[in-house]
């Protein structure tokens, strides 16, 4: 299953990059990449957050998220700033997916933001892997494809 998940993630990564560039996002910019992690409880999530930090990622504070059916998960992001290159993102996805599998935590995809080539930040220009039609409406969880 892990191999097919990673293959799917590689394909989704290329789709996101293509969509961003087609929409005019700056190909030369450094992008904030947010890898979404979730677990059933805080203690489990904290373990993966500590390990991600040791790997060089910035880790956001844990938040509780209610998903379909009323189930509650603890979530955080492992964040890096890199060029928008599929190979770099693929390597991070594989690294974090392997970590989450070892610690029995969910890897919920990755996201990034539109980078204006003119240097102007536009609020709400986020690409979400769940929303293949463009910008996401979510405040903190951009660009995730499952």
From Swiss-Prot:
Cell compartment(s), UniProt: Cytoplasm
Keywords associated with the record: Cytoplasm
Cellular component, GO annotation: cytoplasm
Alphabetical list of InterPro entries matching this protein: RraB, RraB-like_sf, RraB_dom
Chief localization: cytoplasm
Basic and acidic residues composition-biased segments: 135-146
Coiled-coil residues: none
Database matches in Gene3D superfamilies: RraB-like (3.30.70.970)
Biased composition (Acidic residues): 115-134
Keyword Calcium: no
Domain of life the protein comes from: Bacteria
Molecular function per GO: endoribonuclease inhibitor activity; enzyme binding
Ranges where the record places region Disordered: 110-146
The keyword Cytoplasm appears for this protein: yes
Family in the record: Belongs to the RraB family.
Subunit structure: Interacts with the C-terminal region of Rne.
Role: Globally modulates RNA abundance by binding to RNase E (Rne) and regulating its endonucleolytic activity. Can modulate Rne action in a substrate-dependent manner by altering the composition of the degradosome.
Protein name: Regulator of ribonuclease activity B
Species the sequence originates in: Sodalis glossinidius (strain morsitans)
Gene coding for it: rraB
